[in-house]
Regions:
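Active-site and adjacent substrate-binding regions of carbohydrate-active enzymes
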Residues: 1-423
């Protein structure tokens, strides 16, 4: 809670879901802070009574037998006590991130949580950590276990951010994505643990964002993306529908969107004149969170087998693509993405070089970063992974040695595909 400043909000911070982070309360005459929706007030972690309540609640769940916790925006629980104005970057509001991410007491609070709750149970913990750097990640997910087991970082998801933050139609450049991967894999080596993900409930579909979801390339592109994920070092996460290659929904009207972030952003950017309605809709088609929130596609029956209710009763519309992938089709086809993901998991489990202790080294194949290549190794086992996200075939040039079947040290990688080789 904060008092008004000159009769207005305490500062100029903009909320992640649009508008100000401050909501005025008539009863108290004060403002309360909400970094996201006004229905999600930020807890005051500086108050020891609040921390007691949180830890008691967590203990209650642990005693019920939960396996762990995924902690939402946990890097934002400690704020700069001065609450200064932020730089106006989107033309509308001040940027709060320097003052709410990785704040002065965040590690103190997490260590207290660990001592009082987490260390007393057999749990897995992952912290969603907006604004985290590799240096901060070494504290959140350090291998001494004093805070969390691993983090969800967003740097690879932010490679397209520009003038209006996430709202863009640009696709990620592999060169930038590769640089982010290289940094996180190398910087955390032997010091902290990372999660691996492309998809989740807050991100558009991976094959639409990082690959090619056209009918010609959707399946091979999704396999390429899956191979890259499962061959990296860290704990891989698979989001529902990712294993069958679900794509962005590409809704054509703002009325089809349900996410508060998308609706508020559309309203703010179009009413302010920063974007036209068409421009903003194109941004939503590319990066809206609703792309990941359409119903799971089980089969070709009504509502893709998700529900027998009328389509108008669903929370959100189905992907309108009539040729959309379904679990039934994917499970029936032996060479499908679904079976490829299962194979990748088996391969990862059966090769030490691909497991937690396996070292990773990125290889520069070409100046434009196509294809992306890296080596995983443990003991005398070495595995070269090559990822080609380009729309055409590319040659990977590497001194494979006599053990590899490659002519003059070259392997040609087809468009939108991946391969891995013992070397």
């Amino acid at each position: 809670w904060k008092d008004p400043k000159d009769g207005k909000e305490p500062n100029n911070w903009g909320a992640c879901f649009g508008g100000s982070v401050w909501e005025f309360d008539e009863e108290t005459g004060m403002y309360y802070l909400h970094c996201f929706s006004k229905k999600q007030p930020d807890l005051n972690w500086e108050n020891p009574v609040v921390r007691d309540e949180v830890f008691n609640m967590m203990t209650w769940w642990c005693e019920k037998g939960v396996d762990g916790f995924r902690m939402d925006v946990i890097s934002m629980i400690s704020k700069d006590p001065a609450y200064p104005d932020g730089e106006i970057r989107d033309g509308l509001h001040g940027d709060m991130s320097p003052y709410v991410c990785n704040g002065p007491h965040v590690h103190e609070y997490l260590q207290e949580m660990n001592q009082r709750v987490l260390s007393k149970f057999d749990l897995i913990t992952v912290g969603e950590t907006p604004g985290v750097t590799t240096e901060e990640a070494k504290k959140y997910a350090n291998l001494d276990g004093s805070e969390l087991n691993m983090v969800f970082q967003f740097e690879h998801m932010g490679t397209t951010e520009g003038k209006y933050g996430k709202w863009t139609t640009k696709k990620p450049e592999m060169k930038k994505v590769r640089a982010v991967m290289n940094k996180w894999q190398n910087d955390l080596e032997g010091k902290a643990w990372n999660s691996l993900y492309w998809d989740n409930h807050d991100q558009p579909r991976a094959v639409s964002r990082f690959g090619d979801d056209s009918p010609m390339y959707r399946e091979v592109s999704a396999k390429m993306i899956a191979t890259c994920l499962h061959m990296l070092k860290g704990s891989p996460y698979i989001y529902q529908g990712e294993e069958i290659g679900m794509t962005n929904a590409y809704f054509k009207s703002i009325d089809d969107y349900k996410d508060i972030e998308a609706i508020n952003a559309y309203k703010e950017y179009t009413e302010s004149g920063l974007m036209t309605e068409e421009e903003m809709l194109n941004c939503l088609k590319m990066v809206s969170r609703d792309n990941a929130r359409t119903p799971m596609q089980w089969d070709d029956s009504t509502n893709a087998g998700f529900s027998s209710a009328p389509a108008s009763d669903l929370y959100i519309a189905m992907d309108p693509d009539k040729d959309r992938p379904t679990a039934k089709k994917e499970m029936a086809a032996p060479d499908s993405l679904y079976h490829e993901v299962k194979k990748l998991i088996r391969i990862r489990q059966s090769h030490k070089a691909l497991q937690s202790r396996g070292k990773i080294t990125f290889v520069y194949a070409e100046k434009n970063a196509y294809p992306l290549a890296y080596i995983r190794e443990a003991g005398d086992e070495k595995i070269l992974v090559i990822i080609n996200a380009a729309a055409e075939a590319k040659e990977a040039i590497y001194n494979f040695g006599a053990a590899a079947e490659a002519k003059n040290g070259k392997i040609t990688v087809p468009a939108q595909s991946a391969g891995f080789y013992r070397i």
